[in-house]
Amino acid sequence: MNLMNRRTWLLSAASLAAALVVPFRAAHAHSPYRQWDIFRKKHLQILTSRSDLEGDSIGDEWVALLLERLPLSQAMVSRARDMRRVASLLKTDQAKLAVLSHSDAKAMISGGAGFEDYSPIPLQIMLDNGTHVLVARENLPLHHAYVVTATLLEEARPLHLRVPLDGQLGMSVHPGARSAALGEALEMPSAEAA
């Protein structure tokens, strides 16, 4: 092989390798999901929806109280574009808590109009203010539900909050919320276990 053919061949081989490797690397590039998982573990996120302005405002009020009383929770509102996105995030366990109107909660639990693709979602009720509920996935740790509920119940009268002990809207009450409402003592896990 002469020098010119060798250069042409090497250039062609390098181009072919680049054409094959670059798309492979792009398809297997760094994923943000690990950081998202870490973020979710560091911050107490309560989902609301931009399509429910009243629920979003309620979420802001509840999160402000949680931040004031539980600053280490790093509580924050996470706003989804619509209720279908809220359902998707709850269904796939990317979120643990959400503020839902009574009608959205009923529809989400029953797989009603707009939520057929997401039913069943394993949700339990924690709090009700008369128009909206705070719901949690069934796998929300007992002590997390207890602390959130107990903290919000400190302002139960001005926030019009109650824990529906018998369940509501087709959901059972979260055991941690029940314990907080009844004033039961709950042994918190050690820092190593949490």
What residues fall within each predicted segment?
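Short helices/loops that flank or line small-molecule/ion binding pockets
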Residues: 60, 83-98
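Short, well-ordered beta-strand elements
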Residues: 40-52, 78
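A bilobed periplasmic-binding-protein/Venus flytrap-type ligand-binding module shared by bacterial periplasmic
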Residues: 48, 126-144
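A ligand-binding cleft/hinge motif common to bilobed small-molecule-binding domains
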Residues: 95-116
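N-terminal export signals
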Residues: 2, 8-30
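An extracytoplasmic/periplasmic, membrane-proximal ligand-sensing/linker region
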Residues: 157-194
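Short, polar/charged alpha-helical segment
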Residues: 55-71
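Short helix-initiation/N-cap motifs at beta->coil->alpha
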Residues: 71, 76-88
